[in-house]
Amino acid sequence: MTEQKRKLEKLTGVKGMNDILPQDAGLWEFFEATVKSLLRAYGYQNIRTPIVEHTQLFTRGIGEVTDIVEKEMYSFVDALNGENLTLRPENTAAVVRAAIEHNMLYDGPKRLWYLGPMFRHERPQRGRYRQFHQVGVEALGFAGPDADAEIIMMCQRLWDDLGLTGIKLEINSLGLAEERAAHRVELIKYLEQHVDKLDDDAQRRLYTNPLRVLDTKNPALQEIVRNAPQLIDFLGDVSRAHFDGLQRLLKANNLPFTINPRLVRGLDYYNLTVFEWVTDKLGAQGTVAAGGRYDPLIEQLGGKPTAACGWAMGVERILELLKEEHLVPEQEGVDVYVVHQGDAAREQAFIVAERLRDTGLDVILHCSADGAGASFKSQMKRADASGAAFAVIFGEDEVANGTVSVKPLRGTGAEGEKNVQQSVPVESLTEFLINAMVATAEDGDD
């Protein structure tokens, strides 16, 4: 292959890492604005951590025998200093690391939220990507079931704000460490009785992470799993009181839930409450949000013993649901598209476009694609395609007379007439456009 041909080859993105194109950006912005407004209403503060962390953060935090650490992390050795680094597969461990490093809990509990890309090396499919986005909350320093209930109810409010339906809540308790240890012994004994029927994945986990066997999706193992010892039967008084307290709060707020004794989550840092929000509208990838309590994690990562809970949700999956339920908002166009013909008109158009932006209007100023001036007809086609509400037109006559022509592209003009082009003095343009937009909005409300 020649060098010239190599240069002409079309490059594509990495499989499972998707571009967010302009036609989709409006949906992302709608979701982000909705979730940010919700999180502010609950008193949460934004935190932003690097996408690259020391690998040890995740092996210590998530657990060395979890699927994420064993098979799914993008890890590499920094050629400059030999450090083992990893693209973050999740963000709870990183937020906790930041809270410890910057002594954020010295003056009491913190409510934090994040939004950003995560990375996992797995087979791309619908709702599961190698680069994906999560929004999450971390309530650090809160020990009671009231914090668990609040973050769960926060999710329900988000579904309501987005207009989503059919997302169901499942909850469970993983108890405390000594209760999980007692259950682990009995679970291994039980699974050993069926070892010849376990698939390779279950056999691999039998002695390293047997709790995860309960989460298998293999149809052939469902009866074995259904009859396995349940962790909820091993809960002591403290764990049971915490779980009962959570249920009472959810019931008091009329939030329906199902207790799923097989719900265990795939990260080692969880204890007590775990929960998932699930839907049947996304095929196999039915979990749209998940979380729980992770009281041991802060101490495990070098901080003082501190209670904590949180959740994370997959943004792409929620956007899929919005599309499925036809809840995608219409893309808003700009307010004004400025059309001009001739050098003098172009100079005047630049000045006026900036003045309009100074007043808060969104303005596109026509710029030539090939360096030559486009015809009025061509520019007006672009103005209409842009979604702008009005075209502001500068020609030789307008420049000579100190006026502009304003043409409504959607709705009505200032005088209530549809698509009627009017001549307006330049000094009155801003007032005219604002009045025209008010008239258009009122026309749309009728």
Curated annotation (Swiss-Prot):
Catalysed reaction(s) here are:
tRNA(His) + L-histidine + ATP = L-histidyl-tRNA(His) + AMP + diphosphate + H(+)
| EC code | 6.1.1.21
Alphabetically ordered keywords of this record:
Aminoacyl-tRNA synthetase, ATP-binding, Cytoplasm, Ligase, Nucleotide-binding, Protein biosynthesis
Cell location: Cytoplasm
Query: GO:BP terms for this protein?
Result: histidyl-tRNA aminoacylation
Q: Does the keyword NADP apply?
A: no
Key word Ribosomal protein present in the record?
A: no
- Any Gene Ontology CC annotation: cytoplasm
Signal peptide segment: none
Name of the molecule in the record: Histidine--tRNA ligase
Q: Which organism is it from?
A: Burkholderia pseudomallei (strain K96243)
Q: Which gene encodes it?
A: hisS
